[in-house]
Amino acid sequence: TGVKENAFNYRGDFDFVMGEVGVRLETAMQHASTNVPSGEMPYLYDFAKRQQTLVQVNPAFVKRGKKAGLKMGLRLAAEFDELEDNVYVSPDVSADLLVAEGVLFLEGGITGEIMPSTYRGIMEENPYVSPDLDVKTAFHGVRFFAGVTGNFTQETSFTARVAYNVFHDEHFFVNRTFFEGSPGADEVHNNMFEVLYDDGRMLEVSGEFKLRFSQQMDMLLKGTYYGWDLDSLEHAYHKPDMKVGFRMNYRYDEALSFFAGINLLGSRMAKVPGLENGEDAVALKAVYDFNLGAQYRLNSRWNFFGELNNVIASRYNRWYGYPSFGINGRVGVGYSF
């Protein structure tokens, strides 16, 4: 794209403990800056340099017992951004309880989350965005959550979680459009993406179940449901209504292991102006991906891996206008320091 980004991240947590009570101070800073090409295709792109810095300080009172824990604090942050400066304040309250050792664990609370969008992060999320796109920070100011983790037996474990988010400036990908000729002429659909913003609420329900058949074989089933309620937009464009994953792992010996998995990405809506039926949105079918892989661990440092994706060669559109089909794979070498 011709855009270069430099980034720096810092995080430091400090605990001052006196017996079962204490004070915790979480600090973090994220900085990213972009250098952009000048005068490149001005009729299509409007490049602008961007500097964004987010400074976070989260003070909290904590109490830790043998079976229960409590945290009461705030999340405070200041953002200095070429797009807009912001100050964020959200609660940071949580509690947990160990009902039975190795059997049942409960947790819940109210917190918030700041979600800055760097140039690299957006490109990784959607590789087909317009190269001149800068995306604002999303703020999930209030997030209620509750969860349970447990074991039915030594071979089975599960996790269930529910969360309700109230957010501001969440982004949704839509196809960028432009006009042929003068403004007011027919709108032309482009194959690059930009974003629309909206405030709203989201219900998130997730679960995970793991079963170990033997020392060599286990399976994992997990899924998440998303329920969007937006203030202005009709749909949460390109956001799935669910994600489901299933994976089987088999360890042949200490060095060689295999896996097989199926991933499901639920249906999504794409905003497409000018459809013949008068609508401005189209439904994208669910994505099914069956994959296989293997890993060979040569020693404690070196490993080799390979995987095949979309083994059944299904045709789908993760992003509107970009059909994917056919088998694809990758091989690689890993080294641990």
Name every feature range the model reports, one short phrase each.
Residues G39-L44:
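Flexible coil/linker segments and helix-coil junctions enriched in charged and small residues
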